[in-house]
From Swiss-Prot:
PANTHER family, per database record: MITOCHONDRIAL 28S RIBOSOMAL PROTEIN S21, SMALL RIBOSOMAL SUBUNIT PROTEIN BS21
UniProt-listed InterPro entries: Ribosomal_bS21, Ribosomal_bS21_CS, Ribosomal_bS21_sf
Family: Belongs to the bacterial ribosomal protein bS21 family.
Alphabetical GO biological process terms: translation
GO (cellular component) term, any one: ribosome
Protein name: Small ribosomal subunit protein bS21
Record keywords, A-Z: Ribonucleoprotein, Ribosomal protein
Gene Ontology terms, MF aspect: structural constituent of ribosome
Amino acid sequence: MPAVKVKENEPVDIAIRRFKRACEKAGVLSDVRKREFYEKPTQVRKRKKAAAVKRYKKKLQRETIRTTRMY
């Protein structure tokens, strides 16, 4: 968990903002949302496979766009 030390004469709202930024960088919120409900191992595999397919299709699309430009 990220920790933020409040500096001397630093307003609390700025320290809170730094803490929020540190949490966002560490991925705390996304991890909490991901673990909010139990996900079956088959669903995890299915979700990861779908994400991999999506990444692959996106990569192919980017490569075809690069090769078709002839100007």
